[in-house]
């Protein structure tokens, strides 16, 4: 061995790195979108908005038999700690402002699951009800629809799985574009303050407040 070769050997005693089996089992190559989506789909914290019997089936999904929390879906009592809204039951005109206000308080990115026929199309109230909203998607955007009257807990779990698949395929760049252009025509609601209607006089006509005079008796 020449002197120059011996010097190079002493200066670089470590050989070129090789991908071994141990290294391949402990190193994961991924991208930022995959890590971000994996964290979000594993922690879909729902905020329930239940107004009718479908909400009972949703509560059964969190029972010990189905245990929906094993998917990382832990119910939250405040919209500021949630990223998923599940609407179950009929949405009335009176409930609509409260529903939109709660939806606006959920931080982005946020998702909505419509559970049951009443919240999707107003159900049996869609024919002649003057107060039922014909679908919650008239107020807020809906990502997953779960039909049924009421849907079984297995259907609720299937809806959560479908939403997880949708989240897994998203990109942060797409999310930024959707946030700028609004993914739904009615996302940004601006409620106008109105005078209170619960004044106690809403059952009486304004003409009943004035005394009635018979024109034949007036001299």
From Swiss-Prot:
It is an enzyme of class 7 (translocase). It comes from the Bacteria. Its cofactor is [4Fe-4S] cluster. GO terms for cellular component: plasma membrane-derived thylakoid membrane; respiratory chain complex I. Belongs to the complex I 20 kDa subunit family. HAMAP family: NDH1_NuoB (MF_01356). This is NAD(P)H-quinone oxidoreductase subunit K 2. It comes from Synechocystis sp. (strain ATCC 27184 / PCC 6803 / Kazusa). The lineage of its organism: Bacteria, Bacillati, Cyanobacteriota, Cyanophyceae, Synechococcales. The gene is ndhK2.
């Amino acid at each position: 061995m020449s002197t120059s070769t011996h010097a190079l050997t002493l200066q670089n005693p470590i050989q070129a790195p090789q991908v071994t089996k141990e290294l391949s089992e402990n190193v994961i190559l991924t991208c930022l979108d995959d890590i971000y989506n994996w964290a979000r789909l594993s922690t879909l914290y729902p905020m329930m908005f239940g107004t009718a019997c479908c909400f009972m089936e949703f509560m059964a999904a969190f029972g010990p038999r189905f245990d929906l929390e094993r998917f990382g879906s832990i119910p939250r009592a405040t919209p500021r700690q949630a990223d998923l809204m599940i609407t179950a039951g009929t949405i009335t005109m009176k409930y609509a402002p409260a529903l939109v206000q709660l939806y606006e308080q959920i931080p982005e990115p946020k998702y909505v699951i419509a559970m049951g026929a009443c919240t999707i199309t107003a159900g049996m109230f869609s024919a002649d009800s003057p107060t039922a909203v014909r679908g919650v998607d008239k107020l807020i955007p809906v990502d997953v629809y779960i039909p049924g009257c009421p849907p079984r807990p297995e259907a609720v779990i299937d809806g959560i799985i479908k939403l997880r698949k949708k989240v897994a395929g998203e990109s942060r760049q797409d999310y930024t574009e959707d946030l700028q252009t609004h993914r739904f025509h009615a996302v940004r609601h601006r409620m106008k303050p109105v005078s209170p209607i619960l004044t106690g006089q809403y059952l009486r006509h304004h003409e009943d407040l004035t005394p009635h005079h018979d024109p034949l008796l007036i001299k």
